[in-house]
């Protein structure tokens, strides 16, 4: 059986990257929440 997680840098960046997050209001909220929490990594 094939596993569900098949890593790919491109698809990872395109869905969870910083620039993608900044495009939408919800994505910006995610970045803001992670900054407030003090995360070292804000996005992938």
Swiss-Prot record:
Matching InterPro entries: Ribosomal_bL34, Ribosomal_bL34_CS
Superkingdom of the organism of origin: Bacteria
Keyword Cell inner membrane included in the entry's annotation: no
GO terms under cellular component: ribonucleoprotein complex; ribosome
Any matching Pfam family: Ribosomal_L34
GO biological process, one term: translation
Keywords, in A-Z order: Ribonucleoprotein, Ribosomal protein
Coiled coil regions, renumbered to chain: none
Record-annotated membrane-spanning stretches: none
Gene Ontology molecular function: any one: structural constituent of ribosome
PROSITE patterns to which the protein is assigned, alphabetical: RIBOSOMAL_L34
HAMAP family: Ribosomal_bL34 (MF_00391)
PANTHER family per the UniProt record, alphabetical: LARGE RIBOSOMAL SUBUNIT PROTEIN BL34M, MITOCHONDRIAL RIBOSOMAL PROTEIN 34 FAMILY MEMBER
Family: Belongs to the bacterial ribosomal protein bL34 family.
NCBIfam families to which the protein is assigned, alphabetical: rpmH_bact
Protein name: Large ribosomal subunit protein bL34
Protein source organism: Nitrosomonas europaea (strain ATCC 19718 / CIP 103999 / KCTC 2705 / NBRC 14298)
